[in-house]
Amino acid sequence: MDQQMALTWGLCYMALVALCWGHEVTEEEETVPLKTLECYNDYTNRIICSWADTEDAQGLINMTLLYHQLDKIQSVSCELSEKLMWSECPSSHRCVPRRCVIPYTRFSNGDNDYYSFQPDRDLGIQLMVPLAQHVQPPPPKDIHISPSGDHFLLEWSVSLGDSQVSWLSSKDIEFEVAYKRLQDSWEDASSLHTSNFQVNLEPKLFLPNSIYAARVRTRLSAGSSLSGRPSRWSPEVHWDSQPGDKAQPQNLQCFFDGIQSLHCSWEVWTQTTGSVSFGLFYRPSPAAPEEKCSPVVKEPQASVYTRYRCSLPVPEPSAHSQYTVSVKHLEQGKFIMSYYHIQMEPPILNQTKNRDSYSLHWETQKIPKYIDHTFQVQYKKKSESWKDSKTENLGRVNSMDLPQLEPDTSYCARVRVKPISDYDGIWSEWSNEYTWTTDWVMPTLWIVLILVFLIFTLLLALHFGRVYGYRTYRKWKEKIPNPSKSLLFQDGGKGLWPPGSMAAFATKNPALQGPQSRLLAEQQGVSYEHLEDNNVSPLTIEDPNIIRDPPSRPDTTPAASSESTEQLPNVQVEGPIPSSRPRKQLPSFDFNGPYLGPPQSHSLPDLPGQLGSPQVGGSLKPALPGSLEYMCLPPGGQVQLVPLSQVMGQGQAMDVQCGSSLETTGSPSVEPKENPPVELSVEKQEARDNPMTLPISSGGPEGSMMASDYVTPGDPVLTLPTGPLSTSLGPSLGLPSAQSPSLCLKLPRVPSGSPALGPPGFEDYVELPPSVSQAATSPPGHPAPPVASSPTVIPGEPREEVGPASPHPEGLLVLQQVGDYCFLPGLGPGSLSPHSKPPSPSLCSETEDLDQDLSVKKFPYQPLPQAPAIQFFKSLKY
């Protein structure tokens, strides 16, 4: 009965001690290797485990993984790894990862594998404890202080248990009281001893305005038979001891409380506490089995050692007076289910291209067919991180089509596998990264910009090419000789006839009164507007709408010549034309390309200002299409052209004498005589400011033509009229008038209603009668053949020079080209216009009258030098 009561009180005391130490009790901790241990298998032939030890314990002790099979324990060899595969290291430690491979093929659904860790050597300690010599009384409790006047009363209590059972009595204990300021250390604290359960503290013991702290502990009195140590209250003083194994636990102490408990504590190097766990084991007697003390309490320590505590029950101190206590390494482990911890081998990844798309293909390795699994694919740009990659979770497939990728970009992809359904595990390792580069494709924006640029460039090229081609064409066209470029025949020769150049003839010369005066007056105000309505080119002299029938071949008998000349007086006495009569359109040269040509009915075209003769043996007909390329000489004609420079170089011109028979109604007959050849006399009248050549009448019924030193570019062929010439013979040039009959060119009287005179035409070539040209070759005594007509120079009237002759009647006339202008053979662009002396007044009264009138007005007959042709026409342009 007494023993049962003692056991009951012992258990109550242990419960009370446990309540007092409750705030320090903690559960048994798992070590870092056990926390990080994870094992997975392929469920075929191996198990892979991953765990980590702390870096601090690495130099003190090595831990070994143990694999417990059904019939044996296998030590597993592990190697260092770069990282933990499936777990994380605790934040308070620095881990050293390890990886272990365990060959194993006996897998089944009921497997529950057990793993543990063992240090590389035995670790432990042992102590013999006599109870009477290891007594530590319990600490005081229920401590409180209260003011009492100017003193402070500190009170406490101690539970000594049943006096019948307990070895400890109030006579065996005393109390030690320590006090100090709050900021002071306990080593500097003041203390006092008392055997009472209270103490009165005087004010002189304290400093004013300070906070103090006090503590009490129980001590064994000096007269007690027990020995031991005081109760806990303050930390122990630490000092350095002799060198030793720091991984070994030390300072194992056990104290019997004198009642029913044995309190033990030990210290462990703090750096090893993360890797190794220790436990307290004891034997009540040497023959008793070893038991484990629990629970183990860890005291927080600021030093390099960590203190652990554990209390042992002492139910029968008398029966078991000596305990054997030891601290050993605790073996810890856990169970892992194999079919829930499967990790497969990583797949093998490849990539293929299908036209414009890309596909990923992979193959798995060593996967049982009955284990269902799934795949996870990640792909990204090579420059990006895997955190920004795109992830696709697929079923049990072995390929995946990638979406549209950016061109000319490097991509990376990887794949892994994981078991699902009845089996479980974790993802396998990622496969090797597969890298490829997509093909380069021109962006759509670039294509649009290039097309726009090409179109714009093409338009610019076409534009500038067109402009350049047009300019080149114009330059090329300007180099082609063309009569239309010449100002000689533009606007009817308006530029060659200044308004005041003919005023002297119209107002001062009595021989020009009447129709001729009106004719000259109209020259100053003549209008060329009618040229715009003409169907022929402005260079055409003859009106294409009204031409006359060409007369028959000229009769060389004197009668024919007389008949043609009988009409001249009629023309001279003709009155003015009524104003109601329509004015004849101003004719002009006809041209087409580089050729000049008059209507077919004329040997040379008429110039503006000359009237056609009355109809002689012909009627008006519609205009025949004139040759635009040729001017025909009269059939069978022997007319020749001689340059004036050559003619004038032979001597001075003879005076022109005209027979009085020219003024009668009868036609003057040309009597062939054995005299020197008759030459044509040419006269030139030049104005003061603008040189003007007086026209020479061709004697034809269709009018006459004016000429200058040059014509526009081309190869014109002048055509002589087929009708009889109405010219009279005059004196030969350069011969005395007494030795040869004179020829005087004479124009028919010009009606008042006829058009005004046009600009000067060809000037430096004259026509020689056949008799003149043949006289040089005729033998003496044989007269020259009679001439039908010959040009006669009549002063005061326009003169005409017959067109140049060709080697045959219809041959071409070759001109000399200088720049854009052509000149007659033998003349340059700066040739001076030749002229002759005025005719003798005794031979031609009209010429004499004109000379007198001109002499009064002081019009010199000496010619002024003409400007070069090119400069002349440039001056007309500007």
From Swiss-Prot:
Instruction: Name the family.
Output: Belongs to the type I cytokine receptor family. Type 4 subfamily.
Subunit (UniProt): Heterodimer of an alpha and a beta subunit.
Species of the source: Mus musculus
Q: What keywords is this UniProt entry annotated with?
A: Disulfide bond, Glycoprotein, Membrane, Phosphoprotein, Receptor, Repeat, Signal, Transmembrane, Transmembrane helix
Kindly list the GO CC terms recorded for this protein.
plasma membrane
SMART domains documented for this protein: FN3
Checking Gene3D superfamilies in the record gives:
Immunoglobulins
Cytoplasmic-side stretches of the chain, per the record, are: 463-878
Q: Which residues are glycosylated?
A: N62, N350
The entry's protein name is: Interleukin-3 receptor class 2 subunit beta
Q: Which cysteines are joined by disulfide bonds?
A: C39-C49, C78-C95, C254-C264, C293-C310
Q: Which GO terms describe its molecular function?
A: cytokine receptor activity
What this chain does, per the entry, is described as: In mouse, there are two classes of high-affinity IL3 receptors. One contains this IL3-specific beta subunit and the other contains the beta subunit also shared by high-affinity IL5 and GM-CSF receptors.
Q: Which residues form the signal peptide?
A: 1-22
Spell out where the chain crosses the membrane. 441-462
Q: Which InterPro entries match?
A: FN3_dom, FN3_sf, Growth/epo_recpt_lig-bind, Hempt_rcpt_S_F1_CS, Ig-like_fold, IL3_rcpt_beta, IL3RB_N, Interferon/interleukin_rcp_dom
Q: Write out the biased-composition intervals (Basic and acidic residues).
A: 671-689
According to the UniProt topology, which residue ranges lie Extracellular?
23-440
According to the UniProt record, list the residues that bear Phosphotyrosine.
Answer: Y765
Identify residues that carry Phosphoserine: S752, S754
- Taking every annotated instance into account, which residue ranges of this chain make up the domain Fibronectin type-III? 139-244, 343-438
In this chain, composition skew of type Polar residues spans: 554-570
Q: What is the lineage of its organism?
A: Eukaryota, Metazoa, Chordata, Craniata, Vertebrata
Motif (Box 1 motif) positions are 476-484
Give the domain note: The WSXWS motif appears to be necessary for proper protein folding and thereby efficient intracellular transport and cell-surface receptor binding. The box 1 motif is required for JAK interaction and/or activation.
